[in-house]
């Protein structure tokens, strides 16, 4: 019994605290995020404008992550996280008082920027609380609990809208939940001592870049960044366009396409810890390759098939490939936690790349879809193959 207890990954108090934070934030944030497009529509925002605002959300999140990766190293990840959560708790309240589309849209862009502030600090806290001998398993579980929280939050939001038809109720609950998450972080997430004077001027930034180059991490960062772009590029495209593809090409109901998105969350939530465990066993180098192969072959299958049963099986396999890829990215990224001078910048770069994929994906795919509806998954396959080529060209130099 004692051995089983030691083997249970959440026995570690610090890592358990991080996972509870991610679960609480996932629930609270997801009470707000899925209903925002509907809220925009309810106050008169045009569909095309909603798409532009969502892309700008991704852009603002992208641009904030690199500088706040450096800020996180300078002032401490816990302080950065507390400031971001405090600001984020005010955002849902702001929507209650947003009586014009301009105010609401601007607030959503600011929301993306605040999330960008929090992302590098979140990576940093994870990197210093996980068990380095079970790195993949820890990062997989951390991703899974956030996804689980997202599913719970989305279900709460759906219930509120269907039962009470009240955006304000959902926003108030989201604000309260984020504020409680802030209190939890203040109490339960440990603070680490910050080494002053490391990266507070231009010369020290140069030192950071020199250390990245000197340690041979450039190629590894390129692989992680391109993989991060790919993951959110394809996910954002599927979320944005799967409803239209289902109606126009597959001739299915929105109920089916909504279920596909829910299945993605379910697959990711259940498979992420397993994917992390597998990466610990076989190594990230092999898992990257197997994930790319599975994703590319399944995207090819999605281009060809119009049979609903086959389409469903193939897209679930694709989701598995994406989950395993994400597990390897998170596992490799957490390794930079051992390098205090460079970790903030690296977390910011990879996080910004992820946000860039989320911002650019729907825009590019919308043009492709408008040109030819049957080319949606072909466009995604091309991007996936390009990232695979980058990996194959650089993995020997990348120290993965």
Task: Give the ranges of each region predicted by the language model.
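Symmetry-related core transmembrane helices of the 12-TM Major Facilitator Superfamily/SLC fold
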Residues: 169-186, 377-392
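Helix-to-loop junctions at the C-terminal end of transmembrane segments
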Residues: 66-76, 272-283
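Short amphipathic helix-loop junctions that connect adjacent transmembrane helices
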Residues: 35-48, 240-255
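Intracellular juxtamembrane helix-capping segments at the cytosolic ends
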Residues: 117-130, 324-338
């Amino acid at each position: 019994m004692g051995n089983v207890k030691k083997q249970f990954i959440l026995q570690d108090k610090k890592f358990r605290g991080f996972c509870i934070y991610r679960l609480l934030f996932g629930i609270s944030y997801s009470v707000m995020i899925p209903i925002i497009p509907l809220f925009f529509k309810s106050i008169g925002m045009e569909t095309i404008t909603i798409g532009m605002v969502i892309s700008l959300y991704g852009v603002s999140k992208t641009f904030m992550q690199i500088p706040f990766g450096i800020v996180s190293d300078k002032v401490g990840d816990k302080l950065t996280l507390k400031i971001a959560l405090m600001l984020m708790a005010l955002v849902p309240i702001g929507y209650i008082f947003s009586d014009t589309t301009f105010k609401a849209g601007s607030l959503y862009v600011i929301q993306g920027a605040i999330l960008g502030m929090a992302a590098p600090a979140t990576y940093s806290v994870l990197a210093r609380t996980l068990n380095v001998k079970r790195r993949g398993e820890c990062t997989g579980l951390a991703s899974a609990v956030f996804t689980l929280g997202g599913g719970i939050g989305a279900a709460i939001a759906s219930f509120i809208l269907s039962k009470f038809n009240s955006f304000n109720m959902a926003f108030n609950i989201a604000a309260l939940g984020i504020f409680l998450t802030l209190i939890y972080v203040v109490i339960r997430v440990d603070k680490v001592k910050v080494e002053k004077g490391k990266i507070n001027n231009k010369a020290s930034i140069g030192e950071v870049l020199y250390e990245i180059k000197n340690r041979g991490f450039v190629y590894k960062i390129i692989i992680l960044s391109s993989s991060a772009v790919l993951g959110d590029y394809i996910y954002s495209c599927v979320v944005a366009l799967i409803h239209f593809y289902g109606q126009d090409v597959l001739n299915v109901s929105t109920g089916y396409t909504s279920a596909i998105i829910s299945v993605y969350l379910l697959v990711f939530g259940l498979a992420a810890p397993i994917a992390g465990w597998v990466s610990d066993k076989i190594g990230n180098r092999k898992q990257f390759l197997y994930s790319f192969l599975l994703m590319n072959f399944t995207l090819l299958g999605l281009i060809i098939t119009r049979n609903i049963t086959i389409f469903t099986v193939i897209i679930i396999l694709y989701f598995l490939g994406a989950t395993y890829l994400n597990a390897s990215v998170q596992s490799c990224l957490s390794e930079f936690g051992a390098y205090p001078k460079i970790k903030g910048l690296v977390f910011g770069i990879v996080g910004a790349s992820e946000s860039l994929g989320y911002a650019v994906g729907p825009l590019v795919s919308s043009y492709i879809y408008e040109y030819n509806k049957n080319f949606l998954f072909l466009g995604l396959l091309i991007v996936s193959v390009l990232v695979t080529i980058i990996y194959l060209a650089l993995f020997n130099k990348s120290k993965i």
